[in-house]
Design a protein with these regions (language model features):
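Catalytic machinery of carbohydrate-active enzymes
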Residues: 2-202
Length: 202
C-alpha cells in the first residue's frame, strides 16, 4: 500500500515502441471515434493473476484509441508491469485510502475529476471504483463498466459467472471495441540467475 498523494510512474521507451508499431498497423485496427487529444483513464487494481489476464484488454483499448493519451490507475505492486507493457502513456498509483485518510481522498478526487478524462474503462468493477464514478457528479465522462448510470454498461447479468477473459472482452464490445486479443507476455523480461535454474525448466 502507498499512502499519501498519488504517485506518477512515467512510461517512455516501451510505450514509444508500441506507438510506432500501432501507427504502422492503424488502418487495420477497429478504432472508437474520439478526438485525437482524448484523455482516457483505465482502472485496474486487482491481484497479479487478474492483472495479467487484463493485458489483452489493455492492448485492445490502446489499439482502439491509438492517438489518445491513456493513463492507467493501479496499485503499487503492478506499476512496473504497467510501465513495461507499453500500452499506457502514464501510470498513476492509487493508494486506496481508508475512510480516515481524507487528504488522500481529496488527492484522488482531484486527479480523477480534474485530469480531463473523456472516457474511463473501469476493469476493476469494485465498490471503490463505483465511488470514483460518483466523484464526477452530474458531468460524468463516458464510462465503461458496471457502475449504475454509466454510459457504456456491461449489461450481462451473468458476468460474474464468466471467465475473466470473456468478461473483459464482452465489456469492451459493449463499449465499441470489437476484438480483444489474448494476453501477450512476449515483452516480459528479467534476470533469473538468482534462482539457479537448470538450462531446461518448465
Amino acid at each position: 500500500m502507498v499512502a499519501g498523494p498519488l504517485r506518477r510512474v512515467k512510461t517512455i521507451g516501451a510505450y514509444q515502441e508500441r506507438r510506432t508499431a500501432l501507427k504502422k498497423t492503424s488502418r487495420t485496427c477497429f478504432c472508437v471515434p474520439v478526438p485525437e487529444s482524448c484523455r482516457i483513464l483505465v482502472i485496474k487494481h486487482s491481484a497479479l493473476g487478474d492483472f495479467i489476464l487484463a493485458l489483452g484488454a489493455f492492448e485492445a483499448i490502446r489499439k482502439a484509441h491509438p492517438d489518445a493519451r491513456i493513463t492507467l490507475l493501479t496499485t503499487a505492486p503492478y506499476a512496473d508491469l504497467a510501465h513495461n507493457c507499453g500500452w499506457f502513456d502514464a501510470v498513476e498509483i492509487d493508494p486506496k485510502p481508508t475512510l480516515l485518510r481524507w487528504r488522500s481522498w481529496l488527492d484522488l478526487h482531484r486527479f480523477v475529476t480534474k485530469s480531463g478524462f473523456e472516457r474511463v474503462y473501469d476493469l476493476q468493477h469494485s465498490d471503490r471504483t463505483h465511488t470514483y464514478f460518483r466523484f464526477f457528479g452530474r458531468r460524468k465522462p463516458e464510462w465503461s463498466g458496471i457502475a449504475a448510470g454509466c454510459s457504456h454498461p456491461h449489461r450481462n447479468p451473468d458476468r460474474d459467472a464468466m471467465h475473466t477473459l470473456e468478461r473483459l472482452a464482452e465489456q469492451l464490445r459493449d463499449a465499441g471495441i470489437a476484438e480483444t486479443p489474448v494476453p501477450n507476455l512476449n515483452w516480459l523480461d528479467g534476470g533469473i540467475t538468482e534462482f539457479d535454474l537448470p538450462k531446461q525448466f518448465a
